[in-house]
Amino acid sequence: YPIRAPRVGCYGDMMGKAGVRTYGFRSPQETYDVYCYVDHLDGDVFHLTAPSKFTFEEAAKECENQDARLATVGELQAAWRNGFDQCDYGWLSDASVRHPVTVARAQCGGGLLGVRTLYRFENQTGFPPPDSRFDAYCFKRRMSDLSVIGHPIDSESKEDEPCSEETDPVHDLMAEILPEFPDIIEIDLYHSEENEEEEEECANATDVTTTPSVQYINGKHLVTTVPKDPEAASGTISTNFPQTMEPAKLWSRQEVNPERQEIESETTSEEQIQEEKSFESPQNSPATEQTIFDSQTFTETELKTTGYSVLTTKKTYSDDKEMEEEGTSLANMSTPVPDANGVESFTTLPEATEKSHFFLATALVTESIPAEHVVTDSPIKEEESTKHFPKGMRPTIQELDTELLFSGLGSGEEVLPTLPTKSVNFTEVEQIRNTFYPHTSQVESTSSDKLEDFNRMENVAKEVGPLGSQTDIFEGNESVTSTTLIEILSDPGAEGPTVAPLPFFANIGHPQNQTLRWAEEIQTSKLEPSEEDGKPELLEETEASPTEFIAVEGTEILQDFQNKTDGQVSGEAIKMFPTIKTPEAGTVITTANEIKLEGATQWPHSTSASATYGIEAGVMPWLSPQTSERPTLSSSPEINPETQAALIRGQDSTVAASEQQVTARILDTNDQATVSPVEFNTEVATPPFSLLETSNETDFLIGINEESVEGTAIYLPGPDRCKMNPCLNGGTCYPTETSYVCTCVPGYSGDQCELDFDECHSNPCRNGATCADGFNTFRCLCLPSYVGALCEQDIETCDYGWHKFQGQCYKYFAHRRTWDAAERECRLQGAHLTSILSHEEQMFVNRVGHDYQWIGLNDKMF
């Protein structure tokens, strides 16, 4: 309801301000008045009376006798605006009793103008009883406004086509919308079996379900037919994801030299890209995993389990002295990141002493519960060289060229058999989880020249942990392993691969035979070579009590230095499989990552390293031993309680890691060789981020006990940006996904409520009071006869027939006279002609009288 003079009972929700009040959304059963709008009057409203007046029914009949009807409230209001004035109450069509007042008279509405209403009760509720007697207001339409209203002729009966009118409103609606909205994808719903019987009886009806549905996807016209039989629909090509919350797509590109052109992937052809149809998550049918193997040895392996872990190895061969590494893009669904084509990282390595062949083995590990079998295989590039040190490694991120994408939900995930794709679809993700995978470059030489010897699994070091780098060097076996750990953050609703660097700081220390336990575990152990070359081993894992499912992987590296003279290290294998752990009561649920070096002598030694790595920034120290004896190196991460890194939004275009120093001491039982410290500086191009030394962002902290050698990975939740309440001057902080919003108290503005503005700008004072602004406050200087904080209370009233406005009393005289007579009349009343001093006073005078009025000669019109 509108209000101009707030008073008791008329405050509403405007806190004493003039305006339109509201009670909010109310129940339809509640009763209130109604506000109507009338534009113009298309007829005449006239007044009827009789000596004995009329009841409501008599008034309606009397209007009918006049070829009219009872007027509505809107029609009477429009007539009043046109100057209709009648100081007699009369019936209206809604059984209310009203009369219009155009000329203010004391005996007619108390001197007020408008349409006056007669109520039954003092609280202005209820209309008079219908048997009460009043005059009547009738309405008669003008003849020129009459219009001919034609009635539609009933159509002929269509009994011969009883089902012709039965159509699917969804299809009719989509048929109208699709030509105008080419980006809408239509989803057809099957009719139930009950409707099929009715459709058979309708020979003339159109079968909507068999009509090809036209789809428009990015402007391309696709026609697909939705089968009528639900069983036929289930025969479409689909991939089932049992116990999977987030299906991940894997796509890769293989690069081989001319000698190995026969190595092909069965899932990288363009034709098979078109074969990808749909995903059916709820069902638990076995899914087929197409694993890339050598075409001469392996074709395809079907994993016989509903949920399984897959180790997929991407291979890249080259004949030159530099290592080629496939670019990998990671999907960070929580933060938009610009194009990552220009993000590169360089690692300078010592020159190779002899020409050698290298290949990159990137292992992708996904977990699903329960797990029974794992098939792993990796070919080995044979070469007669005895020492292998790659010159340099230059990983480059290429957009959608070679990409490896997965996520690490603990409940399990699958890898789609169709590799090439250009989009990433994520289903429901309840919270952000973390998965780490390594980029591993492996250099190995064997004594055979045959390329078909695939009886040994390459040593692919797999670590799961915070973003960091660990370099294990085994001079004796000439096997160099480098690992770069990268974190993936997933967020629902985002698409496409993006890149985001994440920080990690750690000190590395390793006493003898210690075991490091992480929040996610990878186990690598020996894969026993069978007599039949080229056949992978199946590693069994027994299910445990499914009290709580935790994706656990373990790592175990077996070293055998007995074949030192052969120029290689045998007995190295990898097995990766998830396990199920049942947590005990009262214990913290942690999983373990066991890394043990057996067959070699180890000495307690600690080194320290602190580095920050981003996506594809595999920067690592390359330690060149000074002796040809068999050295061993063991290390484990150790917490650095003084350093935490936060990754927040900023304008800096680069993140430069501080100069770091890694000292590694390689000892042997016969000869102790010391590797000189290696100093390196890392610079990672990350345009939308900056690195600050703070503890506000999510970090991974690793607590290490030197004696028990057991660490726990603690996942710290996101920061509460409103914890310190950055809002000033009493503002309220509300956190958002990326920042916070301050809601300021009256009188302040700005992002942090730091600006003090004029509180009197909104004119909070009432009844013509003057507002005085202060520091975070204001004060109202009231006119005479008004009190209150906002001068809203009137303590004095005017005489009968006078109207009060802003402390002054006004009286309207309807009869016309000259200016001199008007001035004398005002003097006789102890007043003077009105002086219009404000726009509000002008509006008040216009409301009091609808005719022209004399005012003071020295005044101007507002």
UniProtKB/Swiss-Prot annotation:
<feature type="disulfide bond">
    <location>
        <begin position="782"/>
        <end position="791"/>
    </location>
</feature>
<keyword id="KW-0325">Glycoprotein</keyword>
<keyword id="KW-0677">Repeat</keyword>
<dbReference type="GO" id="GO:0005509">
    <property type="term" value="F:calcium ion binding"/>
</dbReference>
<comment type="similarity">
    <text>Belongs to the aggrecan/versican proteoglycan family.</text>
</comment>
<feature type="glycosylation site" description="N-linked (GlcNAc...) asparagine">
    <location>
        <position position="425"/>
    </location>
</feature>
<feature type="glycosylation site" description="N-linked (GlcNAc...) asparagine">
    <location>
        <position position="332"/>
    </location>
</feature>
<dbReference type="InterPro" id="IPR001304">
    <property type="entry name" value="C-type_lectin-like"/>
</dbReference>
<feature type="region of interest" description="GAG-alpha (glucosaminoglycan attachment domain)">
    <location>
        <begin position="141"/>
        <end position="233"/>
    </location>
</feature>
<keyword id="KW-0964">Secreted</keyword>
<feature type="disulfide bond">
    <location>
        <begin position="765"/>
        <end position="780"/>
    </location>
</feature>
<feature type="compositionally biased region" description="Acidic residues">
    <location>
        <begin position="264"/>
        <end position="273"/>
    </location>
</feature>
<feature type="glycosylation site" description="N-linked (GlcNAc...) asparagine">
    <location>
        <position position="696"/>
    </location>
</feature>
<feature type="region of interest" description="Disordered">
    <location>
        <begin position="251"/>
        <end position="288"/>
    </location>
</feature>
<keyword id="KW-0245">EGF-like domain</keyword>
<comment type="function">
    <text>May play a role in intercellular signaling and in connecting cells with the extracellular matrix. May take part in the regulation of cell motility, growth and differentiation. Binds hyaluronan.</text>
</comment>
<dbReference type="InterPro" id="IPR000742">
    <property type="entry name" value="EGF-like_dom"/>
</dbReference>
<feature type="region of interest" description="Glucosaminoglycan attachment domain, similar to chondroitin sulfate attachment site in collagen type IX">
    <location>
        <begin position="234"/>
        <end position="525"/>
    </location>
</feature>
<feature type="disulfide bond">
    <location>
        <begin position="722"/>
        <end position="733"/>
    </location>
</feature>
<dbReference type="GO" id="GO:0010001">
    <property type="term" value="P:glial cell differentiation"/>
</dbReference>
<dbReference type="InterPro" id="IPR001881">
    <property type="entry name" value="EGF-like_Ca-bd_dom"/>
</dbReference>
<feature type="disulfide bond">
    <location>
        <begin position="744"/>
        <end position="753"/>
    </location>
</feature>
<dbReference type="InterPro" id="IPR018097">
    <property type="entry name" value="EGF_Ca-bd_CS"/>
</dbReference>
<keyword id="KW-0597">Phosphoprotein</keyword>
<feature type="domain" description="EGF-like 2; calcium-binding">
    <location>
        <begin position="756"/>
        <end position="792"/>
    </location>
</feature>
<feature type="glycosylation site" description="N-linked (GlcNAc...) asparagine">
    <location>
        <position position="204"/>
    </location>
</feature>
<feature type="glycosylation site" description="O-linked (Xyl...) (chondroitin sulfate) serine">
    <location>
        <position position="407"/>
    </location>
</feature>
<dbReference type="Pfam" id="PF00008">
    <property type="entry name" value="EGF"/>
</dbReference>
<protein>
    <recommendedName>
        <fullName>Versican core protein</fullName>
    </recommendedName>
</protein>
<feature type="glycosylation site" description="N-linked (GlcNAc...) asparagine">
    <location>
        <position position="513"/>
    </location>
</feature>
<feature type="disulfide bond">
    <location>
        <begin position="63"/>
        <end position="138"/>
    </location>
</feature>
<keyword id="KW-0654">Proteoglycan</keyword>
<dbReference type="Pfam" id="PF00193">
    <property type="entry name" value="Xlink"/>
</dbReference>
<dbReference type="InterPro" id="IPR016187">
    <property type="entry name" value="CTDL_fold"/>
</dbReference>
<dbReference type="GO" id="GO:0002052">
    <property type="term" value="P:positive regulation of neuroblast proliferation"/>
</dbReference>
<feature type="domain" description="C-type lectin">
    <location>
        <begin position="805"/>
        <end position="862"/>
    </location>
</feature>
<keyword id="KW-0430">Lectin</keyword>
<keyword id="KW-0272">Extracellular matrix</keyword>
<dbReference type="GO" id="GO:0001501">
    <property type="term" value="P:skeletal system development"/>
</dbReference>
<feature type="disulfide bond">
    <location>
        <begin position="727"/>
        <end position="742"/>
    </location>
</feature>
<feature type="domain" description="Link 1">
    <location>
        <begin position="1"/>
        <end position="38"/>
    </location>
</feature>
<feature type="glycosylation site" description="N-linked (GlcNAc...) asparagine">
    <location>
        <position position="563"/>
    </location>
</feature>
